[in-house]
Regions:
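Membrane-embedded beta-strands of outer-membrane beta-barrel proteins
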Residues: 36-38, 54-56, 89-91, 125, ...
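Transmembrane beta-strand segments of Gram-negative outer membrane beta-barrel proteins
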Residues: 27-42, 64-69, 193-195
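Outer-membrane beta-barrel "beta-signal"
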Residues: 124, 214-217, 243-255
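Solvent-exposed loop/turn segments connecting transmembrane beta-strands
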Residues: 42-50, 78-84, 111-118, 173, ...
């Protein structure tokens, strides 16, 4: 499947800015809103597998504050052997300083059994800017500093794709610079294109993740989403690849 190419082609075929009347209403203040999703994943990179994934994203707006929470995971087996397993969680709080400028603080943790890192955890803080902030189009960028701690591990994969041996290395930590960008475009009243980029760079590793998705509503609460995600670690253990990609098809429930 080539979901990433499909999404890019669809995005190029529509106007950059949709009419404001086509955009969904803004979320209410003081109430947790969000979405849960589950579906199918095709993974390539350190593991080539077909697996299932789940994710929960929630957000709360209270005056100048916005809090966002993420929890996700994927799991797959091949011939009775675990061939994909990843769990991650993140929290970010933004505080508006002006109509366009905000301060942020965030925490992130990932446990991936096939990435070459037993875990990666970071805390970051900095400033962001809302480039577009309408109901139809939202684009923001942020830059900051923080601390990244990770624990490398050397893996040997067996013929079925499972891990046959695992050797933990000492944990490492370093100061990091971080850059992120978040984009959302309502293409119509039922279709939304979104993209989220994160870069964390330090002496131990540079992590780059990007999540591109196209969601189409099939009812008031349900949507079908196709996505293309990448994760690149520039300094993985010698036996492992730098780049992992995920192609996803999910059923999404909004609340």
């Amino acid at each position: 499947m080539k979901f990433g190419r499909w999404i890019l082609c669809i995005a190029a075929a529509v106007p950059l800015l949709a009419a404001a009347d086509d955009a969904p209403p803004p979320p209410p203040e003081g109430v947790w809103t969000g979405k849960g999703q589950a579906g199918y994943v095709s993974s390539k990179g350190n593991t080539d597998s077909k697996s299932a994934n789940v994710a929960l994203d929630m957000a709360l707006i209270e005056g100048p504050w916005k809090h966002a929470f993420h929890l996700g995971g994927l799991y797959g087996q091949s011939a009775g052997v675990v061939s994909a397993e990843r769990w991650d969680t993140a929290w970010q709080s933004n505080h508006d300083l002006t109509a366009n400028v905000f301060a942020f603080g965030g925490l992130r943790y990932q446990h991936d059994m096939f990435s070459g890192f037993q875990y990666q955890a970071s805390g970051t803080a900095g400033l962001g800017y809302k480039i577009f902030d309408t109901n139809a189009t939202k684009l923001s960028a942020q830059i900051g500093v923080g601390y990244l701690r990770l624990r490398p591990e050397d893996l040997t994969l067996g013929p079925s794709g499972g891990v046959s041996s695992r050797t933990l290395e000492p944990a490492e930590g370093s100061a990091v610079g971080t850059f992120g960008a978040t984009y959302s475009q309502a293409l119509s009243s039922t279709t939304t294109l979104s993209d989220k980029l994160l870069v964390e760079s330090g002496s131990t590793d540079t992590l780059i993740t990007n999540a591109l998705a196209l969601a189409v509503k099939i009812s008031t609460k349900l949507a079908l989403s196709v996505g293309y995600n990448i994760q690149d670690n520039t300094k993985p253990p010698a036996s492992l690849k730098k780049l992992d990609t995920l192609e996803t098809v999910n059923l999404v429930y909004s609340f």
